[in-house]
Amino acid sequence: GKGELPDDYFWGDAGNMTTINGLFAAGDATGASSHKFSSGSHAEGRFAGKQAVKWIMANNTMPEVNQADVDALTEMVLKPMAVFEEHSGITSDPDINPNYIIPQQFMFRLQKIMDEYAGGVSAAFKTSDNMLKRGLELMDFLKEDSVKLAARSLNELERCWENIHRMWQADAHLQTLLFRTETRWPGYYFRSDTP
């Protein structure tokens, strides 16, 4: 229980709220393991969702909204559709374009980085300091390319933002793996440089 472990072990409150007031986390966002199972993530997400609703009900104040901020956020959210519309006619295949990247290609790149450098299945769940640092270098390239995400539909627009969120989560995960040098339960990941 909570009283049996040092305070540093607990990253947030008991209701899955992070250290940012009103921001709740579940699944991969709550631990250093890239192999959280969907059943546990589902249960954790349900719990975090219920706690978020309780927090909202207890802290229900109307914010002051600046319409210019809303307009800027709307433009940012819809940018992948504008990128596709602006550049889609320059190639014969809309999936291949030097001016944008479609969500599926972005997802494949992200998965490849995490699988090969963050202790995924293709690396036999092994990683090391050098592998993690290389993964972070490749993640920087992916972040640069994230501004070129393009969407042909509302479904792809959702996939673009899902990829951006996954990219930031993956970056945090790589940073966590780099910081925590111990092996985490053989089968989850193995630090070959500090076994």
Where are these regions (language model features)?
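Glycine- and aromatic-enriched mobile tails/lids
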Residues: 2-195
